[in-house]
């Protein structure tokens, strides 16, 4: 099922890009904070609002908006060992604001929008990539079509959180990969889109996000326990932001970039569970939003994104070593 995205929401989502501003946020950053960033070979096609995931030691960047502000079906794969990008089979349709995750060695792209020029259509599609055949196939559709959602992999399941159709949602649906079946579970306490999510130590963490482009930005951290179908509140981020990326590495969670109205972020934060606090790490060299993050061999890759509020697709490929 597809539903047309309201024109008012679409206009709000792109308003910042129409202003043509490039203003970095005053987010708390410390250039001397621990961690090291390195720039690697850029993507062939600059894109933002991308879906990003790691599979087989490589980084996949799927869909998004190009510099022409039109959605694309492009899929590029980055090999950190050779510092080379290559194109693989495109998505079945152009998609932006989708989310991606790998569950039990299988790569899925979930939801998003298709269409451009303010004529966005919400999607409930689920596509699985088969690397041995270099093909995509459709799977059981998500019950609630939405874009700007986040997904997290945990225990053989994919958790789809939040997003928006005509407004921000607190919808929470779970995909059982083996059964190819969706179910609804306890919704998030806070309705939001453009959030990030990770599976971490048996829980699903929902991080940041926003009510709308010009509305409330959230620092909220909400933690879901699948065993009890319950939520609890975690320590909030140091700064409220939507359009951020997140990754779990070892016993830490990292968040990167994002935007607030008319501002973009370079801030990197790390959750240290030993002190139950988010601490500043070295900021991204290039402030961006509409990004994703993927972990390969102890490093976190953050490709693409927008350099300005709204539209400003970048081909940047930066890697963080904690």
List PLM regions with ranges.
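Bacterial N-terminal signal peptides
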Residues: 8-16
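Bacterial N-terminal signal peptides that target proteins for export
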Residues: 1-8
